[in-house]
């Protein structure tokens, strides 16, 4: 089982990778860096068909105004996602909902101005809280 981190165009994974943990809530963290809107849509579609993915952290990056041309395909990819997702941004203008209006709304939207490591830490904290623990509970001998 894993948490998939999707980094969109202009999202710089180097700014959070040094502080990234190898896992969260007993799940491996898998990162996919997308160079454009088309690859972001393809990654969302692939995540929907991957039984290992339990939750998606979506850092859509700084999508250019031309990305709005792809709104229908991006919205369809989000709406088809069978898992919850958390949107995270370092700028409020990057939020997807105001122009995308997906039916499958994010579990949470995290916006931390100019502080990507904090956005990822908060998003992973939310993920850890929302996903059931994979660790066996400790039991006291009777």
Located regions from the model:
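A short beta-strand-loop structural module common to alpha/beta enzyme folds
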Residues: 28-40
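Mid-chain, well-packed structural core segment of small domains
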Residues: 61-101
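Short acidic/histidine-rich motifs immediately flanking catalytic phosphotransfer sites
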Residues: 48-58
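A generic structural motif
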Residues: 24-31, 53-54
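TIR-domain catalytic/interaction hotspot
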Residues: 40-49, 75
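Extreme N-terminal starter segment of soluble prokaryotic enzymes
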Residues: 1-4
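Short, glycine-/small-residue-rich phosphate/pyrophosphate-handling segment
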Residues: 8-22, 94-142
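Structural motif
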Residues: 6-10, 35, 59-62
